[in-house]
From Swiss-Prot:
GO BP terms in the entry: positive regulation of apoptotic process; spermatogenesis
Tissue spec. comment: Testis-specific.
Compartments, as annotated in UniProt: Peroxisome
InterPro entries listed in its UniProt record: PXT1 (IPR029186)
Sequence motif Microbody targeting signal, location on chain: 48-51
Official protein name in the record: Peroxisomal testis-specific protein 1
Gene this protein is translated from: Pxt1
Organism of derivation: Mus musculus (Mouse)
Length: 51
């Protein structure tokens, strides 16, 4: 009985980690895009001495 409970909790944790990894894989390109756009915007303001 205890072993089945331990197996169920391990399986639940693996599923949660897999979902978290999928969310990270989906969000990574968007985060990179925002970071690059932020750099471009800061460079534009810096070059035009607006900062």
């Amino acid at each position: 009985m205890q072993l089945r409970h331990i197996g169920d909790s391990v399986n639940h944790r693996v599923i949660q980690e897999h979902l978290a990894q999928e969310v990270g894989d989906v969000l990574a390109p968007f985060v990179a895009l925002v970071f690059v756009r932020g750099q471009v915007l800061l460079r534009f303001f810096w070059n035009n001495h607006l900062l």
